[in-house]
Amino acid sequence: MNFTGFQASGKSTIAKAIYYFRTIKDDIIELAKSQALDATPVYGVKSTLSIEHGITLRKALENYLREKFLRTFGSSWGMPNDMYMEYHFTKTCYVKISLENDSRYSTPNYIWITMSNELIRFLKANNHTLSVTPLGISEEDLRIFKKNLYEIFEDSCSVVYIPAGRSMITLLSQQLSYIYATMDDMQKRSLDTCTKDYLERILRLKPEFSEGLQGLAYSSGRSGLSPRLVVQALDLTQKILRGTYRYSNGEEQIVLEDGKYVKINFSSSGQQECVWILNLLFYYLVQQKEILFIIEEPESHLFPESQKYITELIALVNN
C-alpha cells in the first residue's frame, strides 16, 4: 500500500494510526507480563511497561491505550469532538478510539476506548493467567497466551515503523546511545511512540551488523533462505548505498569498494536517510520473520535511479 499527496494531507497520520492499532496485541502481551511480575516480583526481571498494582488486564489496556494515543498523536484538546478512529482486525474483533465531552471527565475531549465483545472476553478470561517462575514469566504460559491472542486478532505480524527525518538520528549516531541513556523515563515518554520504537530498535540491532550485511548474509545460509534472494537483496543495497554498512568498535561506517570507509555522520544526506531502511529490510529478510513495514518517505534524498532500486528492495522483502 502506498500513500502519495501534498504535505499535511494526513499520510503520516494514517501510517501512525495503522501502527497504533496493529501493535495493540504487543501491548496486551507486555501488560500481561507486567501484571504477572507486579503480583509476583522476580529479582533482576524488569517489566517493560508500568502498571497500577492490582489492576485488571482490561483496565490496564484502556489506560495504556489512552497514554499511547497522546504519545502518538498529541493532545486531544485541539481535536474536533467528533473525531474517532476504528480498526477492524476481523469481523468480530475491533478497537475504536473516540472523544467524550462530558462533565464526568476531568478533561475536555476525554479519550474513550471501545473494544469488541470478543476482545473483552479474552481480556477477562486471561486476567492474571501468566505464572511466574524464579527465572521470570513461564515460557509455556506465554506461548499459549500469544497463540490464543494471535487467533483473536488473526495477526501474528510484528510491526516495524521507520519514520521520516531519519538523517538527524543517523547524524547523531555516535552520541545517540549516550543521549538516550541519560534521558529519564519522563523524557523518553515525551518522544512520540513511533520515533521511540525506531530509536530503541536501531540501538538494539546495531551490534548485529559488526560483520556488515555480508555477516548477516552468511547466517542466512543456515536458515534455508534462498541464496539467490540474498544476493539480489545485497546487490540492490550496494547500488542504493554505494557501499556497505558496518558497525565496528562502536562506530557506524559506510565501507567503500576500495576497502576504505566513511563514518556515517560524514556520509551523504542520501546515505544517512536510507541506511537504516536498508539495514532493517535486510535484517528481517534474513531472519525470515513476518513483518509489517511502515516506511515514511523511503525515497527521501535519493537520486531517481536509487529511488527505483529501493522500491525494488521493498517489494523483494515484502514478497
Predicted regions and their residues:
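Switch/communication elements of ASCE P-loop NTPase nucleotide-binding domains
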Residues: M1-A36, Q253-N319
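P-loop NTPase switch/coupling surface
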Residues: M1-C194
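Short flexible/disordered coil segments
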Residues: P41-E52, A217-Q232, Y309-L313, V317
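Extended helical coiled-coil dimerization/tether regions that scaffold
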Residues: H88-T90, E100, S131-C274, N279-Q287
